[in-house]
Regions:
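Catalytic active-site module of serine/aspartate enzymes centered on a nucleophile-bearing elbow/loop
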Residues: 292-330
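N-terminal cap/lid segment of alpha/beta-hydrolase-fold proteins
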Residues: 1-52
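Alpha/beta-hydrolase-fold enzymes
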Residues: 136-138, 142-227
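Catalytic nucleophile-loop/oxyanion-hole region of alpha/beta-hydrolase
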Residues: 66, 94-130, 312-316
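Serine-hydrolase catalytic core
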Residues: 192-293, 297
Length: 330
């Protein structure tokens, strides 16, 4: 009992308000100094949760590039069914960003193993439970590769528009990779020209699905973080591993929009399509991540399917509910 009270004292109120708490996870320092990750949690109602179909399940969510966790509706979806919901703000993102750091920078996606391991240690303090991994965009790539390196650690993997292939496609990636690797050796922190014109953020604002979180404006800039050769080399290495084929070792659900709009100039179609990733390329790449993969294409969904307009968002939740309750966790 005393140990439980000490652990609870490490959690403090989160910016998302009532029902959400956060805990700082100390990690090994890197060349830029001290490094932390941040775990956010929402627990099920103590009375209703004990009878939910997902009691005994922990969910770990990992966000995308230039992002942080703020999707309260998604958290409630899981806790309403009895699961404990956790979200990880990775090192140098969101709640975990510290002054003097390069936002979102990493030189190897494998380095995130430390962030995930720290989160899982905290989640398992109350004893082992079934684990569902939930990743969006870059977080989907990170969790796919993590699951492949940690067979049988997860009971299920849910991917929301995972960044499994470069927007230029396989041949474009293969042509670009040696140039990026060379640049990464010479100047890993050099800044690339800006390519994010803010259209994806504009689409969410027009849909009214992007909430205002006080004090979090810098965590998700309108045009995204600056990108760097060292970081892009890490992403391309991850894409190459997916292209070669991996085995995540658990049932996997991939949710994607039915269409994409290249973000070259603003179009109203961006409010009903993915304007970040070529979803057809992602669907093809999804067939190479495991032996039991379900791919769901959602008409009118945007890049984060859970931030789409009401109808496709409801469809995404229905698909997820049916999949998770239909035997994925057996």
């Amino acid at each position: 009992m005393a140990d439980a009270r000490r652990r609870d004292a490490l959690w403090r109120p989160d910016v998302l308000g009532k029902g959400f708490a956060q805990r700082t996870l100390e990690l090994e320092p890197d060349a830029e100094g001290g490094v932390v990750a941040t775990l956010v949690r929402r627990l099920p109602d103590p009375l209703r949760g004990g009878f939910g179909p997902l009691r005994g399940v922990d969910v770990l969510y990992v966000h995308g590039w230039s992002d942080y966790f703020f999707q309260t509706e998604l958290a409630r979806f899981w806790t309403d069914r009895g699961a404990r919901f956790y979200a990880l703000d990775l090192r140098k993102y969101g709640r975990s960003f510290r002054e003097g750091q390069t936002p979102g920078y990493i030189s190897s996606l494998d380095d995130y193993d430390a962030d995930i391991a720290a989160a899982l240690r905290v989640m398992r303090e109350g004893g082992p439970r079934r684990l569902v991994l939930l990743g969006h965009s870059t977080g989907g790539l990170i969790l796919t590769l993590w699951a492949a390196r940690h067979p049988r650690a997860a009971s299920a993997l849910v991917l929301n528009s995972p960044w499994l292939e470069l927007q230029l496609g396989q041949f474009g990636r293969q042509a670009l990779t040696p140039l990026v690797r060379a640049a990464a050796k010479v100047d890993p922190l050099g800044r690339h020209p800006e390519v994010d014109l803010g259209f994806y953020t504009r689409a969410q604002r027009e849909l009214g699905t992007l909430p205002h979180v006080p004090g979090a404006e810098a965590w998700r800039p309108e045009r995204g973080f600056s990108t760097h050769p060292g970081w892009l080399a890490a992403i391309l290495a991850g894409h190459a591993r997916v292209a070669a084929g991996v085995e995540v070792g658990c049932p996997t659900l991939v949710m994607l929009s039915s269409a994409w709009t290249p973000p070259l100039q603003w179009s109203d179609a961006m409010t009903s399509t993915d304007s970040v990733l070529d979803v057809d390329d992602i669907a093809r790449a999804s067939t190479r991540i495991g032996s039991l993969v379900t791919i769901a294409r959602i008409p009118d969904a945007i890049h984060d399917v859970f931030l789409s307009r009401a109808e496709p968002r409801a469809q995404a939740y229905t698909i997820l509910d049916r999949w998770i309750s239909g035997g994925a966790l057996v």
